[in-house]
């Protein structure tokens, strides 16, 4: 067995309770307020090329100052920049524009793939990775969040030969199938495997 695979299985065994609790939190997210769900979307809009903790801190700061729903682009960009979120001006614009969909985020199709396509079509700043991340964080199942950590992990275990330089829709969907099958082979859900691989790279179960 590949050393990396052994490590993943060990992490899953050691952190299984924590992982299951986190997945339950995701499942319960759509029962929360519209602002809570919108905050999760904004977190995912902020994550490209930015540490998850930095993005999370920025969202928390905006909510504390009542800016997430009401702040202008400049106010939001300033907080993003202060917290180390890359491309703050662009992402601030995405957050302001996404407010138009605040009330519709709880009414997406129940099918994860249909929900993802709708998000990508309608919300500027969301690609396959970001839309998958949001949907996983509000309880959807069966999607892969193919960020650089996950892709490097896939290379380590031999699922892919190289980390692609760019992810077209076709490439994303092809690699997603491989990731989902790999999770199944390990006896995990794709959602659990994602958290395991993140814990392997960062030492913590986050989101």
Regions picked out by a protein language model, each given a short descriptive name:
Residues 55, 67, 71, 104-107, ...:
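Secondary-structure boundary/capping residues
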Residues 46-54, 66-67, 103, 142, ...:
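Short alpha-helix boundary/capping elements
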Residues 1-84:
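Structure-specific DNA junction-binding interface
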Residues 1-28, 92, 99, 110-116, ...:
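C-terminal accessory module of base-excision DNA glycosylases/AP lyases that mediates lesion recognition
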Residues 36-44, 56, 89-96, 132, ...:
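Non-catalytic, well-ordered alpha-helical scaffold segments
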Residues 42-47, 59, 96-99, 180, ...:
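Short, amphipathic alpha-helical segments that act as regulatory/interfacial helices
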Residues 59-124:
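Alpha-helical ds-nucleic-acid-binding substructure associated with the helix-hairpin-helix region
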């Amino acid at each position: 067995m590949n050393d990396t695979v052994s490590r993943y299985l060990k992490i899953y065994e050691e952190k299984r309770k924590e992982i299951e609790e986190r997945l339950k939190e995701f499942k319960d997210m759509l029962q929360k307020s519209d602002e809570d769900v919108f905050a999760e979307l904004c977190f995912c809009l902020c994550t490209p090329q930015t540490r998850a903790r930095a993005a999370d801190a920025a969202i928390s700061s905006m909510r504390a100052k009542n800016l997430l729903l009401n702040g202008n682009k400049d106010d939001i960009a300033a907080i993003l920049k202060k917290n180390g979120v890359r491309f703050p001006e662009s992402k601030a614009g995405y957050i302001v524009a996404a407010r138009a969909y605040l009330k519709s985020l709880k009414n997406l199709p129940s099918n994860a793939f249909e929900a993802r396509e709708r998000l990508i079509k309608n919300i500027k700043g969301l690609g396959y990775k970001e839309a998958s991340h949001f949907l996983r964080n509000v309880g959807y199942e069966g999607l892969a969040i193919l960020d650089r950590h996950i892709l490097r992990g896939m290379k380590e275990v031999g699922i892919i030969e190289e980390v692609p330089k760019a992810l077209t829709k076709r490439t994303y969907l092809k690699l997603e199938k491989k990731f989902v099958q790999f999770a199944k082979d390990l006896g995990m859900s794709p959602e659990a495997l994602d958290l395991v691989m993140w814990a392997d790279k960062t030492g913590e179960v986050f989101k």
